[in-house]
Amino acid sequence: MNIEQIRDYTLSFLGVTEDQPFGDDIITFRLEGKIFVCLWLGGGEHDIKETGPRLALKLSPERNEELRSQFEAVTPAWHWNKKHWSDVYYEQIEDTLVQEWIRESYLLVASKLPKAMRQKYIPSPPLAVEDGVKK
């Protein structure tokens, strides 16, 4: 994936907004004001030339540990709470995995919203239907 593909994919989720509170070289993506993806663009104070293109994702502590142990391209996030955030060097990871992790980050943040808001972003599981009768 490239920067534009990541941006387009992340903005495709319901309720996502983007801003640049940390300068022109970083885009943050938010759901109801809560950041769940931070995308480094390069240049400026946060140049990616030495480290490579990356994004930071908010994931559960257990998931962060799991991904860091499986992928060299997933590391504790620079400038974020390392327990809850990982840097993903997305050019070194399959696109489908990057998309899966972005979606996972979105759903994690959505799951922490108040119930009335949460229902808007997390689809309810379908009711089981057996012989045409909802269970």
Predicted segments, located by residue:
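Charge-dense, helix-prone N-terminal extensions
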Residues: 1-135
